[in-house]
Amino acid sequence: EDCKPLEVNNDTRWKAGVFNKDKPQEDEDSDEVITKKALLILNKLSLTKFDKLSDDFIATGIGKNEKILHDIIWTIVGKAQDEPHFAAMYASLCLKLSQTPLELEADAPKKGKKFKKLLLERCQQEFETNTAEKIADATKDVEDEEEKAYQAGLVKKHYIGHMRFIGELYRADLITIKIMLFCLPALLEGETTF
């Protein structure tokens, strides 16, 4: 049989969103668009481009409402856990965000408190989760011992990354000595360790 090339159907083929004129454009101020823009900038963030990109990150409007702020905080904490060598950079970004007045705090007497409160709640929630249980959850459906060890290693890496991020938040004065004094005995007793 003779093979002929596939025919291109311009009506149904995939087109990049930028070039797709038929697709209705999303509202620039929608939560989804703001979150996407912020995540794109966050993925480009590095120590050399920190000043410019952190300003761009704040300018996206992440302080418009609590849902966007919540999603962004979860992402920042997750990235700090995955990339512990950049924990200081993410802590600096958090410091800059806490010092920036957010739109949702327009009527609040103290600016920056909402971000800091949500960040500390997320860090506390992550700190208080039992790492042994997280390892058990991650490896319960895995049969291969090598894969189990890999999954357990990932959970431990996240845990260590989170501890480093907490330390960097303390160095940036976002966490008080009182909180650190609460964390240290828990770490030294071995209750939350693996």
What is the meaning of each model-derived region?
Residues 1-194:
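Alpha-helical interaction scaffolds
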